Amino acid sequence: SLGFGNLYSTPGDHIGHFYQSREEWSDVAIPFVRAGLEAGEKCVYVIPSKVERQALLEALAATGLNTDRALATGQLELDEGTHDAKAMQDFLHRALSEIPAKYPFLRWGGDMTWSLKKLPTSESLMTWEAHCNTVDNPPAIFLCQYELRAFAGSVVMDALHTHPLCLVSNTIHRNPFYEKPEAFLRNLARRKATETTRIT
């Protein structure tokens, strides 16, 4: 279970959630992480500030979860993100290396506003997003949450191109704008050769 809306996922699902308010964000992020912890899964959530991380922990604790234990054992990792796509890829593969020896499954989520503080260009962000689609049969699901007001329209369109599934009004939809990673990265490299686009 994804933890919200009576929705279920399959291994390898990469879901884009495009939201307009923090309430929309929390209505998805909190139950998503909670469901993973309750199922004994490894949970990673990337979130940009200490204040927001603390708020997420408090919301999870309010549901009855022992967040201190989850953090201490490594079942739950809250991270602020890194400065380049390669470092994020390494982080992902380190988390995947714990499956299934320590945990049955990896639940990876992120409030993508972390990239506004960490990554220099939209190309770096989209290289990371496309990489998530190249991992063969991952024992994982990925949820990427984009605040529409925070990102340029061109970045939102690229995010659509890198997510096979989209969450809209508590319904998962196959994304008709999705491009396979090889084709997307070729197009991205072609664009990068002529222009570098800032994230905001």
Region roles according to the model:
Residues 1-200:
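Non-catalytic regulatory/interaction regions at protein termini and inter-domain linkers
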